[in-house]
Amino acid sequence: METFVCLFKDSPQQRSDAWHAVRHTQVGGSDLASILGLNPYKSYYITLAEKANLFKKNLNRAACSWGTLFERVSKDLLELFCQTTVIGDNIHIDGTYLGYPGHSNSPDGFCYLTLGYTQQSWEIKTIFNNVCYEATKRIPVLVEIKSPYNRKIKNSVPSYYMPQIQSGLALSPPISMGIYVEAMFRVCGIHQLGWNSETNIDIHPPESMLPLAWGIITICSTQEHTEAPQDFGTLDAETFRQLLETLYQKDQYTIHYSMPYETACPEMPNVVGYFGWKVFIFQIIPVMKHPQFLKDKYPIIQQFLRDLHTIKASPSPMETYEKICCSEESPLSTEDIDNFTDMLT
């Protein structure tokens, strides 16, 4: 696993300008559900228009900031709960090296997990499993992390995330299993941190269970800031949403993370404010590699790239785009979509 990750140490770092530029010319793992007709929120043709720069992405900036903030926390918790280390969380895997030019994947990382065998099945070993296993083995896995802002968490992988995971597995030959990590975080004031269910109930519904862990996210200005830090964990829902949208402008702020179970605010310069977090659900769902996934779906990726090239090369991109939308049928039939969803779930 380490040798494989090192192959991409010089690739564009995730969320860098170079990474954004490359992704604009490729079909990334997160684009796949849309072009395969599995994304209920975005279609093949909307994705095509975005890649062709015909209009800007309609981003939910608050939800994007939330996911980015808590991706790092989720990695820390995964390392703690599974006694592992996540690597390769900043690489970009270009599919050209495997014969899939124009396709790429930017995984949330790779790590080793211990599987324990009991009652005729294998399960992922965590610090919460007080089990004497008949046998154990350690395997490398691909990591995909989601931290929904307000979507309810279910004990399964949403079908529109499966293509992203299968893409990462297909472009990672040494890895045969992925894990889908989904966590439910809640915001709280600093005074609410600790072994209790208290959270900011203006932002989230009340919780009745105790948290698995908690910590502090500190927000610092990149400019000199001398005002007293604010406890953002006590804001009302709308003001906190506005804060998340402000944090989307990453060049204005730096983010610092406490270790899990910290309750004291750190002392550092230019602190604008901080807020506490608690995690109440932390799911780790195994996903096995589907060997034929990328081979079967690559023709649709190629069709998308041809459409994209046609639009970009046209002297009238919008007119060409409209012709493509009007003249082509959906890349997948309804039956294909149903069959593909059944295959992955």
Swiss-Prot record:
Keywords: Host cytoplasm, Host-virus interaction, Inhibition of host NF-kappa-B by virus. Its main location: host cell. Gene3D superfamilies: 3.90.320.10. GO terms for biological process: symbiont-mediated suppression of host NF-kappaB cascade. It is found in: Host cytoplasm. SUPFAM superfamilies: Restriction endonuclease-like. InterPro entries: NF-kappa-B_Signaling_Reg, PDDEXK-like_dom_sf, Restrct_endonuc-II-like, YqaJ_viral_recombinase. One of its GO terms (cellular component) is host cell cytoplasm. PANTHER family: EXONUCLEASE, PHAGE-TYPE/RECB, C-TERMINAL DOMAIN-CONTAINING PROTEIN, EXONUCLEASE, PHAGE-TYPE_RECB, C-TERMINAL DOMAIN-CONTAINING PROTEIN-RELATED. Belongs to the asfivirus D345L family. Interacts with IKKA/CHUK and IKBKB. Plays a role in the negative regulation of host NF-kappa-B signaling pathway. Mechanistically, recruits IKKA/CHUK and IKBKB to suppress their kinase activity towards NFKBIA. This is Protein D345L. It comes from African swine fever virus (isolate Tick/South Africa/Pretoriuskop Pr4/1996).
